[in-house]
Amino acid sequence: MAEIGFRRNMGLFMAVMIGIGATMGPGIFALPGELAHMIGPLGILVYLAMGFLTVFTALNYSELSAAIPLAGGGYSFTHRTLNRPTAFFTGWFFWIGNTLACSMYALIFALTIRAYFLPEASIPLLTLLTTVVFTAVNFMGMKEAIIVITVMNLVELAVLIGVAALGFTDIEPANLEPLAPMGWGPFVPAMALIYISYVGFELISNAAEEIIQPGKNIPRAILITLGISTAIYVFVVGVMMLSLIHISEPTRLQV
């Protein structure tokens, strides 16, 4: 029986859209306020440091995806290079991790919808509806899912850049003083807090068998995704810290 494979019909742009859609989730809307409360203006450096450290993971995924351009990402890497038990557990860990991440994203999305549009809505119901809608979109097919992802990515980027650009005119350098009102102790815990904001680009490798010229486009897509995400995070958080707040003692920013 002949094996049924995937069609390579996804270019660099579509691969980047997958990466940005998975990486720039609701975390950028929910975490900066917690970060400001936790560490103050030093949060700008936290995002920069996390972006720098993530480069090493991104380079690993780039190299492995180019060498093993198979669907499955991390599972395929371990299956080809190690052994079946390791690949089995790797696949399950990815599945569990992504399921938990998607659950968190759906919850944050529901909280945002209720906060700004439907104050009387039920959070469990909104979370369930969000999960059902996006699951249905994925079942429609890759082409339809990419269209939805692209539209949502462009809207999200426009909102983030637009809001940050408006706040850019109100920047006050004095808000950087003191830079670390809570000290440097929370720096590493703060990096752990925002870690999930840098997770997602690895999903590009999961679609390796559908990407045209995977050896060239996958590494490019991964690094472009990480670069865009880091730049947007630093810009948005930097403007927020410099224009909206002045932290001289622990205070919580409401997002």
Model-found features: residue ranges?
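Alpha-helical transmembrane segments and their lipid-water interface positions
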Residues: 18, 29, 54, 58-61, ...
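Membrane-interface "cap" regions at the ends of multi-pass membrane proteins
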Residues: 1-33, 37-42, 48, 54-55, ...
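Hydrophobic transmembrane alpha-helices that form the core helical bundles
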Residues: 34-38, 46, 55-131, 136-139, ...
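Helix-loop-helix junctions that connect adjacent transmembrane segments
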Residues: 2-6, 44, 48, 117-125, ...
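Residue-level recognition of membrane-helix boundary sites in multi-pass small-molecule transporters
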Residues: 14, 42, 86, 144, ...
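Hydrophobic/aromatic residues within transmembrane alpha-helices of membrane transport systems
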Residues: 11, 25, 64, 83, ...
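Select transmembrane alpha-helical segments in multipass membrane proteins
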Residues: 9-19, 45, 83-96, 130, ...
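A short, hydrophobic C-terminal helix/tail in secreted or cell-surface proteins
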Residues: 247-255
